[in-house]
Amino acid sequence: GNLNDISARALNILKNVSFVACEDTRQTIKIMESYNFSNHLISFNKHNSKNRIPKIIQSLKSGQSVALVSDAGMPGICDPGEDLIRTARSNELSIICIPGPCAGITALVSSGFPSSKFIFEGFLPKKNIEREEILLEIMKSPKTSILYESPYRLKKLLNELKSICGGERKIKVFRELTKRYEEHIGDTIDEVITFFENKEIKGEITIIIGGFEKEETNDIDEINLKKELHLLVKAGLSLSSASKYLA
């Protein structure tokens, strides 16, 4: 993220807690060096969280305080901090959240899409069945949807979204939010696919998908028809055979 986004309250916490649990100690050291202070750091990430959580809980029970820091964004959103917080709550330990940057909310506000009702999906599952179920829900949902994705998998996801939601579905893709090379891309899925064609994608990606806008019509419900077509093709029918079946 951007070092200037950290609050005075967050800096005060980092200075005065017993120790700091951070996703990458090297990144947290940069923050401390920038503001001329230090503290005891331990690594806490997806690779060591199962072993670290019991030790951190024991430290908290003994009266120590700990600050949880992620590499970017809000700790506990799409990272192992969620498991630590849940375990601390189950042990009736005090949790205080210090407000800070969150890519999903930053992108949502910047998108211009309706923000009073939205769905946060984070990173989609890798298993095809679970993934398709969520994409089908996004396809028919009137609410704005928020996704995170790796730059290496973005093109695959965009093609999946086009297949299920259609190329004209409203979308905004945000790259490197709050950083020097921040980008806001697109208006439709087709536009975003064209933009990234033949490009090497780098950086952190946040995707905002506009809700489905149902047209007033007496014809067959297009969403249900498209869903049925998708399921028939998935079941093994060719696209032409499935189309004839539904005709």
Regions found by a protein language model. Name each.
Residues 144, 151-247:
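A contiguous loop/helix-start segment that scaffolds small-molecule binding in enzyme catalytic cores
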Residues 61-121:
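Short glycine-cluster motifs
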